[in-house]
């Protein structure tokens, strides 16, 4: 039996159908850019004045679109005045936003400066049976489990005291990371909790055009195949804000421009809406809000707020995985 010959056009069609779904999604999504993090504050002006203290090279207090603000690089931190101190992870149920933060060229020197300025450090436990420390490099290396900590102690292993990450406790209880990387101080990430990190990454990619970080050789990291729901979480490791340790994996991240939406798992789910809490939402900008809103509605994305005036522009609000509120602002 003679098999039919495929035409060149048919071959091209097959290749096109076989292209990764994430690449197709990115190609059809209009450009969205990271715009701001929006906090609730009892004193927005004082809150905005805080950030240039720890991050003097990259943060400046200003106003934007009617809000007290911090300008850092190409993004803003905005503040809305509220009557009572907003809930954070210490005073209320956990939301999907864990913290946001800066890359710094020397996290230990920055930490020393923070203490000299009298800023509050959010310390971490270095082990289940250990002590509170400022930086991850004050702990035994490698983000170890308690079993690994005991093994390293027996071998005489010591903390490196080089680089690492630590945290400030800022105005209204906001947590702000100081993470050594590169040679330039810059705002670089929002750190999220998601029950199913892979599902969240797929959602950000498919609906918002986020990019997965490049792997080895600069090649885009491929999306995982099959069921994205997490079946097994890694054991807890240290340092940790909880003495019982912190579940760090499976983790992940996506990028909007050079801002990372970094993800740690939240086993068991139950994260509450970010609205009204310390980190109310974060925002992306679009050149054509009507186009973006129409597409997202067609894709079945949940809307919290329809298109409305936003200062001298317009905005809308959607809800993403684990009840993260994401504002869409129009920037022509």
Sequence positions of predicted segments:
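Short, structured motif recognition centered on aromatic/hydrophobic residues
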Residues: 34-39, 77-79, 97, 176-178, ...
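Conserved catalytic-core motifs of GNAT/GCN5-like acyltransferases
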Residues: 58-65, 211-220
